[in-house]
């Protein structure tokens, strides 16, 4: 927002619903002008973030596409790796790192710049230790998958290739903090350029491993390690070699202080996001226990891949909204945080509607990117309606979660996710899938309408009833608390 509207006193802010008119906009030259200003601010973050998300996710999609043309078993194994082994850990570590959006975003808004570098170093340590604790999921992937009901051939192949993605697992610990560190400083173009370079390298390496050296499924998965670590190398060099002079002041012994308190905050963020992320991973695992599991897993994994690809857009809005809300609250501007929320939700919903229509129109052609099997393509076609509904709901829900991250509500949203997803959605999906014999369509439909839809509705209610002036005050108190804590250490 501009200085005039940003400095306007908020009168009776607590009683004004989120979706009512923005009075400061009229004072600053009209609603349209304020919407345009806020839209530019959001797109400055979201635009490069969308490209970054698409490029990063495309690394896994391209890998899956290569595997799909090797055979149905290979596609199923890669799908399990992406959605279970990597997917579970990705969700937890990304969720824990999202606490940096609250800390760095509000510190940046309050002009406490040096703390961003300290926070990033602390999260490198925290996430690296978490990666060590999560290693058994890779080392014992085969027995774990067999225990939860996956077929022996899929479990054996998945366990073999799981060992080849352990370097990617540890890459998460360094990439996520670097990404949030730069993102909160609005250096999204740097992140996007690095992601684009890494994607281009991955395509070459993947083709070379699979078709040049004929390494098959092992070469396909091994190629994933190269772009992730290249991305980290580029971002690290930029951050530490003059690109962030205000926020990076060198390695600090302060990185080893306050780790326990930050871990507690990270746990709330991790639980909030991973409960949501794991929800759809569990859908994949339950499908593996159905009759004709290979076709069911392949078709659902294709739908989840398309959804995940499109999901990079609302996730960019998740990140952008979190940064905008955190910056405004850190600057003491509750009104600006509220207005940023309105604009961000509206933009994301419009894009979601567009892609929903695209999926409905091209419902019978979606699967051809990943497979040439007629049975798999028909199964994907049958699931396209549910895919469209999922895309539409996900155009709103992540943005609301971004508001939660920017405001520091992670612990509350974690309870909401637990209740909606696992106490309502999951049992509903199981009932529809097995008791009423609707198979994968029943499981997915039950989990969408029983979990995601209810969770989105609750978040809408919470956001519309939010007292934004009070949130700005709490942000100021939180920043002072951490500064005093660091001074004491």
Curated annotation (Swiss-Prot):
Q: Which domain of life is it from?
A: Eukaryota
InterPro entries listed in its UniProt record = MATE_euk (IPR045069), MATE_fam (IPR002528)
Q: Where is the signal peptide?
A: none
Q: What is this protein called?
A: Protein DETOXIFICATION 26
Keyword terms, alphabetized: Membrane, Transmembrane, Transmembrane helix, Transport
What is the source species?
A: Arabidopsis thaliana (Mouse-ear cress)
An MF annotation (GO) of this entry: antiporter activity
Pfam families documented for this protein: MatE
Q: How does it sit in the membrane?
A: Multi-pass membrane protein
The family note in this entry says: Belongs to the multi antimicrobial extrusion (MATE) (TC 2.A.66.1) family.
Q: Give a yes or no for keyword Transmembrane helix in this entry.
A: yes
Q: Which residues cross the membrane?
A: 42-62, 75-95, 125-145, 157-177, 190-210, 217-237, 271-291, 300-320, 342-362, 385-405, 416-436, 442-462
- Which compartments does it reside in? Membrane
Alphabetical GO CC annotations of the entry are: membrane
One GO BP annotation is: xenobiotic detoxification by transmembrane export across the plasma membrane
- Record has Hydrolase as a keyword: no
């Amino acid at each position: 927002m501009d200085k005039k509207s940003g400095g306007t006193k908020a009168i009776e802010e607590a009683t004004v619903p989120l979706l009512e008119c923005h009075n400061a906009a009229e004072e600053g030259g009209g609603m349209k002008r304020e919407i345009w200003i806020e839209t530019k601010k959001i797109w400055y973050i979201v635009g490069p973030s969308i490209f970054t998300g698409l490029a990063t996710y495309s690394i896994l999609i391209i890998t899956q596409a290569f595997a799909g043309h090797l055979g149905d078993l290979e596609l199923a194994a890669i799908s399990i790796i992406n959605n279970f082994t990597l997917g579970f850990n990705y969700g937890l570590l990304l969720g824990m790192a999202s606490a940096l959006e609250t800390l760095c975003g509000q510190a940046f808004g309050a002009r406490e710049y040096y703390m961003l570098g300290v926070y990033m170093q602390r999260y490198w340590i925290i996430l690296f230790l978490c990666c060590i604790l999560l290693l058994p999921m890779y080392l014992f992937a085969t027995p774990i998958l067999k225990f939860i009901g996956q077929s022996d051939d899929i479990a054996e192949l998945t366990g073999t290739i799981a060992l080849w993605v352990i370097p990617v697992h540890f890459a998460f610990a360094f990439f996520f903090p670097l990404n949030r560190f730069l993102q909160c400083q609005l250096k999204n173009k740097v992140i996007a350029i690095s992601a684009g370079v890494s994607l281009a390298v991955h395509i070459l390496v993947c083709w070379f491993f699979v078709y040049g050296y004929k390494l098959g499924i092992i070469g396909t998965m091994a190629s994933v390690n190269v772009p992730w670590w290249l991305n980290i190398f580029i971002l690290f060099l930029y951050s530490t070699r003059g690109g962030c002079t205000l926020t990076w002041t060198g390695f600090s012994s302060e990185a080893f202080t306050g780790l326990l308190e930050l871990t507690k905050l990270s746990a709330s963020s991790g639980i909030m996001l991973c409960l949501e992320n794991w929800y759809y991973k569990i859908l994949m695992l339950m499908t593996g226990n159905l009759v004709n599991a290979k076709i069911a897993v392949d078709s659902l994994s294709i739908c989840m891949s398309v959804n995940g690809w499109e999901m990079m857009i609302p996730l960019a809005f998740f990140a952008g909204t979190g940064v905008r809300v955190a910056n405004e609250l850190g600057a003491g501007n509750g009104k600006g945080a509220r207005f940023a929320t309105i604009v961000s939700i509206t933009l994301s919903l419009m894009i979601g509607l567009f892609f929903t229509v695209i999926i409905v129109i091209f419902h019978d052609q979606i699967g051809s990117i990943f497979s040439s099997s007629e049975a798999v393509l028909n199964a994907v076609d049958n699931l396209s309606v549910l895919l469209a509904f999922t895309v539409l709901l996900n155009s709103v829900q992540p943005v609301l979660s971004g508001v939660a991250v920017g405001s520091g509500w992670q612990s509350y949203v974690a309870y909401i996710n637990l209740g909606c997803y696992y106490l309502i959605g999951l049992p509903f999906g199981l009932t529809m899938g097995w008791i009423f014999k609707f198979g994968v369509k029943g499981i997915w439909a039950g989990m969408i309408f029983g979990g995601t839809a209810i969770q989105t509705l609750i978040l809408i209610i919470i956001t519309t009833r939010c007292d934004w002036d009070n949130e700005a005050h709490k942000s100021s108190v939180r920043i002072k608390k951490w500064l005093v804590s660091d001074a004491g250490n």
